[in-house]
Amino acid sequence: MRPPAFWFTPPDSPALAARLLAPLGQAYAAATARRLRAPGHRAGVPVICIGNLNAGGTGKTPTAIALMQRLAARGIEAHVVSRGYGGRLEGPVEVDARRHRAADVGDEPLLLAAFGRAWVARDRAAGVRAAEAAGAQAILLDDGFQNPSVVKDLSLIVVDAAVGFGNGRCLPAGPLREPVEAGLARADLLLSIGGPEAQRRFATDWPALPVPRLTGRLATLQMGMDWQGARVLAFAGIGRPEKFFASLRAEGAELLRAEALDDHQPLGEALMKRLEIEAMALGAQLVTTEKDAVRLPPSFRQKVLTLPVRLEFDDGAALDEALDRLGLAARS
């Protein structure tokens, strides 16, 4: 289901629907605040939470990949712990791409497992214990900023600079899981992801933030594929599929059709066969995201290309300093 447009009107001029739903949003915020008072498990290794204030996709997965690689470059073995949204396994279980499918562990953990060790656990504290017992020197919590079951040593809030915090209201009146002020008061760093214009707009709409702000962008990973003039039928079931379509256009691809699916939508044989027939009629190549690709039926994995992206920090000094303070300096 796509988010309603009124979630993203300016904070100082909310739509009528947002105003009518405001009491429910206030109740949601109060429930979140009560839940956060519960005590959490303290791990024996640093725990870094990659979270957000918005519901839906903001760029947490590429941020987790970037942090895994950054810590690996320091000689730190970091494990990711995720709830495994969309998967059937409760865990804790270590993700193994050789035997697990997205239906087992969720698409995001399956993708993250290609970059390091990843765990799925409905009970995050149990997942952290399992990762620590398996030798994790640091733990990355994929989401879970509003879940108190694990004590966080560093909380990094990720936001899509193009949409910011929307109208600044909590679900269902807006896109937020909790008020901006309350969330940032518990955070250590804010990462806004987007191009220069989106970053400028975010800075204007949300000035005087109480935490250090990092900026970054999602850059296409060059894999030797020349997209210039390529005729494609693109499909994506991520938080903001239009960003993926824009990336393809920026690479020079000719999008003959772009199909926005629901976030985490299953890619069954019937759906994929329909897309394949449409692509053949258009003389187009099927293309999707890395995260969607792990949900493809086996019979389509060789038929669909991906456009991988990686997070590039504009200046990661504040992040490096925070990692150093956690005792995660480079090791020989």
From Swiss-Prot:
Record-linked InterPro entries: LpxK (IPR003758), P-loop_NTPase (IPR027417)
E.C. code: 2.7.1.130
Pathway assignment: Glycolipid biosynthesis; lipid IV(A) biosynthesis; lipid IV(A) from (3R)-3-hydroxytetradecanoyl-[acyl-carrier-protein] and UDP-N-acetyl-alpha-D-glucosamine: step 6/6
A biological process term (GO) from this entry: lipopolysaccharide core region biosynthetic process
Pfam family, one: LpxK
Task of the protein: Transfers the gamma-phosphate of ATP to the 4'-position of a tetraacyldisaccharide 1-phosphate intermediate (termed DS-1-P) to form tetraacyldisaccharide 1,4'-bis-phosphate (lipid IVA).
Similarity comment: Belongs to the LpxK family.
Protein name according to UniProt: Tetraacyldisaccharide 4'-kinase
The organism of origin for this protein: Cereibacter sphaeroides (strain ATCC 17029 / ATH 2.4.9)
